[in-house]
Amino acid sequence: MTLPRFDQIRPKIEQHIREVKDFPKKGINFRDIMPLFTNPQLVNELCVVIADHVRHTVGHVDSVAGLEARGFLFGPQVAIQLGVPFVPIRKKGKLPGATIEASYVKEYGEDRVEIQEGAIKNGDIVFLIDDLLATGGTLRAATDLVVKAGGKVGEAFVLIELAPLNGRSKLPDVNLTTLISYDSA
């Protein structure tokens, strides 16, 4: 069986993304991926396609790391498809035990993300996954976190990229794949 490629699954995914104007505040057009989860077969198909993409473009990966919270919706299933561990990247203070952390700048200050110490081993190749790339701060911090833990980002994948916010510019050293890119934020 030939697995569908990104260009074949993209229109199906786009049909399940809802634009919500002025959310969470006026002037923001929120891209809501939650309607996608009303179709479990499509979510499964997407995760199979992502895993197939990883096998053919990155090759070997040691783990899949997903960013809190919506990276957790796809990351574990992609990791299962690849037969590798899933590493949750969480906001500071959400993981027990010793952690490694990295910071990033938000609109009104600094925030931190972390992983549990030992979740990524020295030399591990990691596939990063999240739902959205906007300004790039969170994905930059996640990349820095993987490197700080001794790993290397084999590729980063986002479901949606808001191109006008130029988040890609913060990731010049990252092989980044986007399923859907919007020309308006």
Curated annotation (Swiss-Prot):
UniProt keyword terms in alphabetical order: Cytoplasm, Glycosyltransferase, Purine salvage, Transferase
SUPFAM superfamilies from the UniProt entry: PRTase-like (SSF53271)
CDD domains: PRTases_typeI
UniProt EC number: 2.4.2.7
Protein's pathway: Purine metabolism; AMP biosynthesis via salvage pathway; AMP from adenine: step 1/1
Secretion signal, residue range per the UniProt entry: none
Single GO molecular function: adenine binding
Keyword Cytoplasm assigned: yes
GO biological process: adenine salvage; AMP salvage; purine ribonucleoside salvage
Catalytic activity: AMP + diphosphate = 5-phospho-alpha-D-ribose 1-diphosphate + adenine
Biological function: Catalyzes a salvage reaction resulting in the formation of AMP, that is energically less costly than de novo synthesis.
Family: Belongs to the purine/pyrimidine phosphoribosyltransferase family.
Protein name from the UniProt record: Adenine phosphoribosyltransferase
Organism lineage string: Eukaryota, Metazoa, Ecdysozoa, Nematoda, Chromadorea
